[in-house]
Amino acid sequence: MTKPNDRELYEGEIATYWFDDGILVSLSKSPKRTVENIKANVQLVRRITNNKPAPLLIYLSNSPVPDKAARKYSTEQLPVIYSAMAMVSKPGLAKFIMNLLFALKKPPIPMKSFTDDKEAKNWLKQYL
């Protein structure tokens, strides 16, 4: 996935964001997730979306496994900033992340993994 050059981009430490037909798109970057950089990312997303949860299409990248505190904070913030999440990745990566974050309880928002971004966008449209 490459960044578009026909719309406004929002750069953060852990991702680049843009809108595509009302869906917030995220191109994940590879630094290790920490509570600090996740907090900064939450603030960035809130600013981009005017504090309104938005459906997210995220292109996952390989990054180091976050520690327990970062995983906990991340899962607590999901429903604050996103209404649903579609993860696009190589087969297996999104499933690994889902198992890592939600092994013991279901996700706080609708989440689904895809290998095809067109299918992911179609699924997210129900959350617009």
Can you describe what each PLM-predicted range is?
Residues 1-128:
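Amphipathic, Lys/Arg-enriched alpha-helical "gate/interface" segment within cytosolic domains
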